[in-house]
């Protein structure tokens, strides 16, 4: 199970769905623009 768009996440343990990124600056699942 993965985290969907704009779900809160942990940068060091990225469980976002494919193509989403999780960064320390923006700790939620989103597209890497």
Swiss-Prot record:
Function according to Swiss-Prot or TrEMBL: Voltage-gated sodium channel Nav1.7/SCN9A inhibitor.
Domain of life: Eukaryota
Disulfide bonds, paired cysteine numbers: 2-17, 9-22, 16-29
Protein name (Swiss-Prot/TrEMBL): Mu-theraphotoxin-Osp1b
Organism encoding this protein: Orphnaecus sp. (strain Maanghit-Cave/Philippines)
Keyword Transcription regulation: no
InterPro entries noted in UniProt: Huwentoxin-1
Pfam families registered for this protein in UniProt: Toxin_12
Subcellular location per the Swiss-Prot or TrEMBL entry: Secreted
Family: Belongs to the neurotoxin 10 (Hwtx-1) family. 22 (Htx-4) subfamily.
GO molecular function: ion channel inhibitor activity; sodium channel regulator activity; toxin activity
Distribution of this protein across tissues and organs: Expressed by the venom gland.
Sequence intervals crossing the membrane: none
GO cellular component: extracellular region
Domain free text: The presence of a 'disulfide through disulfide knot' structurally defines this protein as a knottin.
Keyword annotations of the record: Disulfide bond, Ion channel impairing toxin, Knottin, Neurotoxin, Secreted, Toxin, Voltage-gated sodium channel impairing toxin
Tagged with keyword Disulfide bond: yes
